[in-house]
């Protein structure tokens, strides 16, 4: 009874991401030099005030107008991820999983990526032009929820990272050690400690299972 009550009251939150996967001719050429261009991933934002404004917009269900960016061009470190001489780029930002004006992310995703996310990246790079982009695929809250059952409502962290859902309390009090109430059934994934985006939950759960089996 207590376990079911905790499950029903678990909060996944209302924050998702808008993510675009690019196939590129060239890796992004950042204006502040080769060292940045050869770094595998970047965090891009204007100011702390801009970040505050973005979270206010997310709370209000508004698509962020001047978002910070997370970009990763893993092919600068691992060329095998793309055909010879080509590159890939992932770029995303936090957004509300549902828009307060009734629009669907699936309907506005191309416009938002082109006119907000890409335009922001172009402020910091010299070559993120139309001729450099070979193709793209865009993930939204809807596609994330459809493709991965752990991403409930398109939220990517496996549940809110509030104090009541962190550390010893993730996912529930007394259940932070990857055991479920059912014997020999274990829990893993982003809803378990340490949470989505940090990884290692599968490895930790596997080690717990091996320890229980006497290995």
Regions found by a protein language model. Give the residues of each.
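Mid-domain catalytic core of redox enzymes
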Residues: 1-82
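C-terminal structured subdomain/cap of oxidoreductase catalytic cores
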Residues: 1-2, 8-11, 17-29, 86-88, ...
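Flavin-binding catalytic cores
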Residues: 27-28, 59-65, 106-149
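Short, glycine/acidic-enriched capping/hinge loops at junctions between secondary-structure elements
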Residues: 33, 102, 198-199
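Short low-complexity stretches enriched in small and charged residues
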Residues: 41-51, 114-115, 140-146, 158-160
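A glycine-rich dinucleotide-binding beta-alpha-beta segment and adjacent secondary-structure elements
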Residues: 65-72, 127-193
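Amphipathic alpha-helix from the class-I
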Residues: 96-104
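A generic secondary-structure boundary signal that marks alpha-helix termini
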Residues: 100, 126, 211-214
């Amino acid at each position: 009874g207590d376990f079911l009550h905790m499950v029903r009251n678990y909060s996944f939150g209302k924050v998702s991401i808008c993510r675009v996967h690019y196939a590129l001719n060239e890796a992004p050429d950042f204006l502040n030099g080769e060292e940045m261009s050869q770094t595998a991933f970047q965090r891009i934002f204007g100011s702390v005030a801009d970040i505050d404004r973005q979270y206010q917009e997310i709370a209000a269900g508004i698509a962020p107008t001047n978002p910070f960016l997370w970009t990763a061009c893993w092919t600068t470190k691992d060329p095998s991820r793309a055909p010879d001489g080509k590159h890939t780029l992932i770029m995303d930002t936090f957004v509300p999983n549902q828009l307060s004006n009734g629009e669907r992310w699936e309907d506005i995703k191309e416009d938002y990526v082109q006119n907000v996310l890409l335009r922001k990246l172009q402020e910091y790079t010299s070559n993120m032009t139309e001729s450099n982009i070979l193709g793209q695929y865009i993930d939204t809250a809807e596609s994330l929820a459809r493709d991965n059952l752990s991403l409930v409502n398109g939220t990517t962290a496996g549940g809110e990272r509030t104090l009541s859902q962190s550390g010893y309390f993730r996912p529930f009090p007394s259940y932070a050690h990857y055991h479920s109430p059912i014997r020999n059934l274990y829990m893993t994934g982003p809803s378990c400690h340490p949470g989505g985006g940090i990884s290692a939950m599968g490895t930790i759960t596997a080690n717990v299972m091996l320890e229980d089996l006497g290995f």
